[in-house]
Amino acid sequence: MTSPMVVGVDGSESSLRAVDWAADEAARHGVPLRIVHAYRWYRYEGTALARELGKPSEHVTSEDILTVATRRARRHHADLSVTTEAVPEEPEYVLLREARNASAVIMGTRGRGELTDLLLGSVSLTVATEAHCPVVVIRGDHDNRAADGRHGRIVVGVADAPTAAVRFAYEEARRRGAALDAVRA
């Protein structure tokens, strides 16, 4: 793989756990990491300037989110090639566009309780069903750093014909000695 791994961030702890996993995987595969923050506040709040910076306030927030995510990615992989971008657009559209040139798209979930922990959010679901590359959704509130021997199970959705997602899941399960569950709806 030479295409970057793309991770979507929103400033939540869940998205930062996705950054941990994505950075580990990008380093393991020897590919760059691209961190993307999509924001849509400007449509609802208008554009307010951050007085001292001369920038719209949503840009300051995006820059902060990307700075924290980049520091987190480099915490364990100082030499990892990392690029970032803040895009004033709906997250699902941004991530689907990024998926065209990505080796994989990684994102967290924002579950708020036992029931919501079982469900994917609308962005995760949209990207997972429409992306043209493998999509990894990092779930849970534990350490999600990608380490060999710590993956018990990898789950992939399958269709009628083999897809990039199936090949990706098979290869990752093989590398890690993990069980591979194929699910068909």
Model-derived features with residue positions:
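Structural beta-alpha unit
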Residues: 1, 14, 71-105
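A short acidic, glycine-rich active-site loop
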Residues: 53-64
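A short, basic/flexible loop-to-alpha-helix module at the beginning of a structural domain
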Residues: 141-150
